[in-house]
Amino acid sequence: MKKYKIYFLLFTIFSNTLISQNLADKKVLVVWGGWDGHKPELFANHVENWLIKEKADYKIINGLDAYDNYDELIKYDLIIQSVTMDEISKKQEENLLKAVLSGVGIAGAHGGLVDSFRKNTNYQFMIGGQWVAHPGNIIKYKVKMLEDELTSGLSDFEIVSEQYYMHYDPNVKIIAETKFNDEIYPWINNVVMPIAWKKMYGKGKVFFISIGHDPDEFMVYK
């Protein structure tokens, strides 16, 4: 099988999602925190290595204090978030949503973006979905790439990770998908679920990819 770095899928689409240009001199905010089980600090480290390579102007913040100041948030071109099962204050949520609405991009992977704040439906509306289950936990499954400018040149692949089952907005543009089988829950056999999507929230671009239960998945050859 031809070797293929999975993280290329994530980071290439991050870059293209930003402004369809390279990241050199663009301002990027990386926010990590929440549940330690998703290794958010490791995710932030992998992203930092990529941002250094891309010559981006970046800042990394541990915790939701990153969203305290709206005037600071709107200075960024892109926010990359890895925060799972945390609680965001009303003001922090308002600042984040307003910043993206005004044109700041937001991107992330797995529960770090789509299971961040379970009580906050306005946040979920912005992102485009919410995790609800991962039948079978860590399993092998196929990822099918769909035709899109962001996936040009990318091939279908298999991965061992959590296969996310989500409630998602029909308005998202799905660019990669997976199909469930009947081994765990027979009633979801052949259900097709997004693996990655893009959408707009006001002027802001949103990108999500569901792989990445362990951030090292992005560094593994398949």
List each language-model region with its residue ranges.
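Bacterial Sec-dependent N-terminal signal peptides
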Residues: 1-23
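Short, flexible, glycine/charge-rich loop motifs used to bind or transfer phosphoryl groups or to couple energy/partner
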Residues: 18-21, 68-71, 163-165, 196-197
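Helical hinge/lid and interdomain linker segments adjacent to catalytic or ligand-binding clefts
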Residues: 21-31, 35-114
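Alpha-helix N-cap/helix-start motif
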Residues: 40, 89, 116-119, 186, ...
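Catalytic beta-strand/loop cores that center a nucleophilic Ser/Cys/Thr
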Residues: 51-54, 75, 129-208
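C-terminal catalytic histidine-bearing segment of alpha/beta-hydrolase fold enzymes
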Residues: 70-71, 206, 218
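A glycine-rich, often tryptophan-bearing local segment used as a flexible ligand/cofactor-contacting loop or short
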Residues: 86-153
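A short acidic/glycine-rich loop-to-helix N-cap element
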Residues: 213-222
